[in-house]
Amino acid sequence: FLPLILRKIVTAL
């Protein structure tokens, strides 16, 4: 998993 995608998921929370 890329950090960019992971951060986007965290921001969606």
From Swiss-Prot:
Outcome of mutating R7F: In crabrolin-minus; decrease in antimicrobial activity
Phenotype upon changing L4K: In crabrolin-plus; increase in antimicrobial activity and gain of ability to interact with LPS
Keyword Secreted recorded: yes
Keywords in alphabetical order: Amidation, Antibiotic, Antimicrobial, Chemotaxis, G-protein coupled receptor impairing toxin, Immunity, Innate immunity, Mast cell degranulation, Membrane, Secreted, Target cell membrane, Target membrane, Toxin
Tissue/organ expression: Expressed by the venom gland.
Domain of life, source organism: Eukaryota
Residues recorded with modification Leucine amide: L13
Misc: Negative results: does not interact with lipopolysaccharide (LPS). Has no antibacterial activity towards some Gram-negative bacteria (P.aeruginosa, P.mirabilis, K.pneumoniae) (MIC>600 ug/ml).
Protein name: Crabrolin
Source organism of the structure: Vespa crabro (European hornet)
